[in-house]
């Protein structure tokens, strides 16, 4: 089992490496807004590249950030940061970035999908690197303003200049990540582990586990309201404990009955067959099969996603959850 021996912090990074360089942040959504403001507040020269003059354009202006059309933002940029959704990046690259960017400009990503699966093939004379914050954009901004930072991953795909890592760490410092710590990785590792986590636990796994547990109780005649509390609603409390204190801390916080039941039945439910299917899911990611399917799905208008979302919205557990929201919120203390 490999483990990194190096975590980069403020002392390993220097903003002077990119001072005076023009940075174009493409996109002004959750991450784009946070990055642009943090980099600006770190004393760097930042513009935002957008495809049209809409709400994001006006929001950037109100935040004191200069918005430009993408092709205008990249033509003079030394560093181009892609912070638009994965499936928009290839089209944006082909139509609005590649034809207009200046020779040798750096290409920066927050997720490795498009580079790893070769949907974007960068010029040979560009440094290509990634800084991937391990938190949503609003948290990246909130922590920065409070003097902290969200941890991040850093990876170098192309190092033509010989200074790609130094520039990547400077960007990481500019958004506040080095205040916490930046862990080195590769585009391959970040992409494959990110997709795996989303599919088998964070979105896919936990969603299906909650659904299966809820439906099992309801099918056996238990009230759906009670089933919802026991299989879905209480999950937040346990996840919060794991987040704050680790798995050991969570186990120490629950009852002895819960500990014994969890340690015995948990392995019965998540057994070797499940682990085998997890490995199969990982192989689909590593082979590129998932990426191929997702690109095709996206091109067809995402029918699987649309139909799946509709099924979830119309499910019994969702209806019960919506009915219980007022009850759940009623007991929360006023802040």
From Swiss-Prot:
Q: Which domain of life is it from?
A: Archaea
One MF term from GO for this chain? magnesium ion binding
Where does the signal sequence lie?
A: none
Residues that hold Mg(2+) 2 according to the record:
194, 230, 234
InterPro entries in the cross-refs: 6-PGluconate_DH-like_C_sf, KARI, KARI_C, KARI_N, KARI_prok, NAD(P)-bd_dom_sf
Q: Which family does it belong to?
A: Belongs to the ketol-acid reductoisomerase family.
Pathway linked to the protein? Amino-acid biosynthesis; L-isoleucine biosynthesis; L-isoleucine from 2-oxobutanoate: step 2/4; Amino-acid biosynthesis; L-valine biosynthesis; L-valine from pyruvate: step 2/4
Q: Which residues bind substrate?
A: 255
Enumerate the Gene Ontology biological process terms: isoleucine biosynthetic process; L-valine biosynthetic process
Name the catalysed reactions.
(2R)-2,3-dihydroxy-3-methylbutanoate + NADP(+) = (2S)-2-acetolactate + NADPH + H(+); (2R,3R)-2,3-dihydroxy-3-methylpentanoate + NADP(+) = (S)-2-ethyl-2-hydroxy-3-oxobutanoate + NADPH + H(+)
The enzyme's E.C. designation: 1.1.1.86
Q: Where is the active site?
A: 111
Cofactor: binding details: Binds 2 magnesium ions per subunit.
Q: Which UniProt keywords apply?
A: Amino-acid biosynthesis, Branched-chain amino acid biosynthesis, Magnesium, Metal-binding, NADP, Oxidoreductase
- Protein name as it appears in the record: Ketol-acid reductoisomerase (NADP(+))
